[in-house]
Amino acid sequence: MQIFVKTLTGKTITLEVESSDTIDNVKAKIQDKEGIPPDQQRLIFAGKQLEDGRTLADYNIQKESTLHLVLRLRGGQ
């Protein structure tokens, strides 16, 4: 299925995923497309930050859902 990931710059990335994919998998796909290391990615859906070990199905993310990508910069918290 296709999902969309919107970045803070307003760019939208289209990803091909399965419901059973983990958030880790999704971050790896974003890294492939955008070169952003997964440890710098925070994915938000429906106001919730998505945890790496969970699947898209756990969050009820369905086809053509839009996730929001926020970058976590190195350094301070």
Curated annotation (Swiss-Prot):
<feature type="cross-link" description="Glycyl lysine isopeptide (Lys-Gly) (interchain with G-Cter in ubiquitin)">
    <location>
        <position position="48"/>
    </location>
</feature>
<comment type="function">
    <text>Ubiquitin exists either covalently attached to another protein, or free (unanchored). When covalently bound, it is conjugated to target proteins via an isopeptide bond either as a monomer (monoubiquitin), a polymer linked via different Lys residues of the ubiquitin (polyubiquitin chains) or a linear polymer linked via the initiator Met of the ubiquitin (linear polyubiquitin chains). Polyubiquitin chains, when attached to a target protein, have different functions depending on the Lys residue of the ubiquitin that is linked: Lys-48-linked is involved in protein degradation via the proteasome.</text>
</comment>
<dbReference type="InterPro" id="IPR019956">
    <property type="entry name" value="Ubiquitin_dom"/>
</dbReference>
<dbReference type="Pfam" id="PF00240">
    <property type="entry name" value="ubiquitin"/>
</dbReference>
<dbReference type="InterPro" id="IPR019954">
    <property type="entry name" value="Ubiquitin_CS"/>
</dbReference>
<dbReference type="GO" id="GO:0005634">
    <property type="term" value="C:nucleus"/>
</dbReference>
<feature type="propeptide">
    <location>
        <position position="77"/>
    </location>
</feature>
<dbReference type="GO" id="GO:0005737">
    <property type="term" value="C:cytoplasm"/>
</dbReference>
<dbReference type="InterPro" id="IPR029071">
    <property type="entry name" value="Ubiquitin-like_domsf"/>
</dbReference>
<feature type="cross-link" description="Glycyl lysine isopeptide (Gly-Lys) (interchain with K-? in acceptor proteins)">
    <location>
        <position position="76"/>
    </location>
</feature>
<feature type="domain" description="Ubiquitin-like">
    <location>
        <begin position="1"/>
        <end position="76"/>
    </location>
</feature>
<keyword id="KW-0539">Nucleus</keyword>
<dbReference type="InterPro" id="IPR000626">
    <property type="entry name" value="Ubiquitin-like_dom"/>
</dbReference>
<protein>
    <recommendedName>
        <fullName>Ubiquitin</fullName>
    </recommendedName>
</protein>
<dbReference type="GO" id="GO:0003729">
    <property type="term" value="F:mRNA binding"/>
</dbReference>
<keyword id="KW-0963">Cytoplasm</keyword>
<keyword id="KW-0832">Ubl conjugation</keyword>
<comment type="similarity">
    <text>Belongs to the ubiquitin family.</text>
</comment>
<dbReference type="InterPro" id="IPR050158">
    <property type="entry name" value="Ubiquitin_ubiquitin-like"/>
</dbReference>
<keyword id="KW-1017">Isopeptide bond</keyword>
